[in-house]
Amino acid sequence: MTEVLDLHGQDSDGGSEEMVLTPAELIEKLEQAWMNEKFAPELLESKAEIVECVMEQLEHMEENLRRAKKGDLKVSIHRMEMERIRYVLSSYLRCRLMKIEKFFPHILEKEKVRSEGEPSSLSPEEFVFAKEYMDHTETHFKNVALKHMPPNLQKVDLLRAVPKPDLDSYVFLRVKERQENILVEPEADEQRDYVIDLEVGSQHLIRYKTIAPLVASGAVQLI
């Protein structure tokens, strides 16, 4: 895996920014997205382009293995690496689908009010899934319960009925880029806000909403 891959992202002004990654760097990006998604309480920004590039890379690796000499130890090693990558990829996608099913009305509402140029939390396929899941949930509620209730009770507000992601939950993180003057909210009413500096390589247990922007920017890694 030595070829170079192009990955399109967004710069700070919302424009297109092209990143050139080696396959090893691409897999590292996938693993970072997987760990962040696994430990974040909310659905994070969609990494659809990384997923697409990884799937293309897996197909390319499969083709190379088909042409390789059978019985070669390298073939077995590359096959194991492919299975590891497939596991990470499928686990990442399953984690996102579970969050969509758990928080779908809030995710769709966030998508509705998202400003132009702001990264989406959903890939196009995930958006379709979330919409269909909400439609099926509403239909199920109507058929099972709501149609048997008085007319004034035959509507359900899913935004109120479905719990929101708990952004006050605590997460472990490792600092990748030094951060200064991070405002930390007090845990008790009698305490005051205070600021901390995050040094590269240091690990912390901290409330998620305090460092959510740093997770999005890649300055910290959830662990």
From Swiss-Prot:
The keyword Kinase does not apply. The modification N-acetylthreonine is found at T2. It is found in: Nucleus; Chromosome; Cytoplasm. Gene3D superfamilies: 1.20.58.1030, 3.40.5.60. Keywords: Acetylation, Chromosome, Cytoplasm, DNA replication, Nucleus, Phosphoprotein. The modification Phosphoserine is found at S12, S16. Highly abundant in testis. Weakly expressed in thymus and bone marrow. GO terms for biological process: DNA-templated DNA replication; inner cell mass cell proliferation. InterPro entries: GINS_A, GINS_bundle-like_dom_sf, GINS_Sld5, SLD5_C, Sld5_GINS_A. Pfam families: Sld5, SLD5_C. The keyword Phosphoprotein applies. GO terms for cellular component: CMG complex; cytoplasm; GINS complex; nucleus. Required for initiation of chromosomal DNA replication. Core component of CDC45-MCM-GINS (CMG) helicase, the molecular machine that unwinds template DNA during replication, and around which the replisome is built. Component of the CMG helicase complex, a hexameric ring of related MCM2-7 subunits stabilized by CDC45 and the tetrameric GINS complex. Associated with ORC2. Interacts with HELB. Belongs to the GINS4/SLD5 family. This is DNA replication complex GINS protein SLD5. It comes from Mus musculus (Mouse). The gene is Gins4.
